[in-house]
Amino acid sequence: KSFNFKYNFIKLYGGKNKYGQAIYSNYKIIDEGEIEFPNSSNNVIFADIVKGKDTMRVYSMHLQSIKISTDIHEKIDEEKSKFIFKRLSEAFTVQQQQAELIKKHFEDCKFSKIICGDLNNSAFSYVYRTIKGDMKDAFEQAGTGFGKSYNYKYYPARIDYVFVEENIEVKEFKSIETFQQ
């Protein structure tokens, strides 16, 4: 579905139950591609979009999930604690590898970049710092409140981000509140 945009790049996977990512634009897409992660259903897609005389690369990414339920109970015993720690350690290792692949791809890009995606990690993480680099966090530029994008039972978490180059002005940022886990 094009959602009334003139151009799109859609990358779908799966058989009967499809999943994937898409980039929609009112401006012409002149190139597109994907960064595939080894042994993962997660990935990054990108599109080079022309507006006037400027070309920018837009990335959409979905990194490894940490697989923690939003319904965390107050009482966690030692066994459950070890299980959660193991799951986090495994996910963070995979995310680190994914972030480093993405960073390498950024280095070869000659256009200004806009990066959008689900990092499945906090703004205090290695993954966030690696992918953000010297770019601006759009929420920090123009957002308000917690900016939550994942609604844990006892606290909000921001795991989805938009980063832009210094030469791109962030005029507005809205967090969509209708999505619930």
Predicted feature residues:
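Structured beta-strand-rich core segments of catalytic domains in phosphoester-bond hydrolases
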Residues: 2-69, 162, 169, 174-177
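Short aromatic-enriched loop/helix-cap "lid" or pocket-rim segments at secondary-structure transitions
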Residues: 69-73, 126-128
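A long, amphipathic alpha-helix that forms part
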Residues: 86-111
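Metal-dependent phosphoester-hydrolase catalytic domains
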Residues: 104-113, 119-181
